[in-house]
Regions:
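An amphipathic, basic-hydrophobic helix/alpha-beta surface used to engage anionic
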Residues: 22
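Non-catalytic interfacial helical region
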Residues: 1-6, 10-13, 17-19, 27-134
């Protein structure tokens, strides 16, 4: 479901989804959306936050998959941010993101941030997995 930034607060008042994809070419608007989602998550008890930034081909996707399934030591619910500044996770990342979406943990709120994406990327299998039944801003 596509949500515009000005609609985000109203949408969040109806409840959080498990995964949000935030992308665009306006860095300030992307940051505002992420801040709004983080605050909504905190209010719902997602107090432990981990950030994974994908930088090149050396990112450990298995660590991300394990983090999503691990129980938190300090809180019941956790927020995981996945930042993909290049907008291209690569073949391993594509597979990992699809597996991640197939096994979403209800005690994990996931925020995926990306730059503006071209049509080919939006039609890719990994991006479609992020979209199906979820929200993107």
């Amino acid at each position: 479901m596509q949500i515009r930034l000005e609609q985000l607060a109203a949408q969040l008042s109806k409840g959080l989804k498990g995964l949000y994809t935030v992308y665009g070419d306006e860095a300030l608007l992307v940051q505002e959306a992420l801040d709004t989602l983080r605050e909504a998550g905190r209010k719902e008890g997602f107090t432990e936050r981990t950030v994974h930034t994908v930088q090149g081909a050396h990112f450990d996707w298995t660590e991300l998959l394990a983090a999503a399934q691990a129980m938190s030591l300090f809180s019941d619910r956790q927020l995981i941010e996945i930042r993909i500044p290049s907008g291209k996770p690569g073949r391993d990342g594509s597979d990992a993101l699809q597996r991640y979406c197939d096994a979403l943990n209800p005690d994990v709120l996931t925020l995926v941030s990306l730059p503006r994406l071209d049509k080919a990327t939006q039609n890719s299998a990994w991006f479609q997995a992020l979209e199906i039944g979820r929200a993107h801003v």
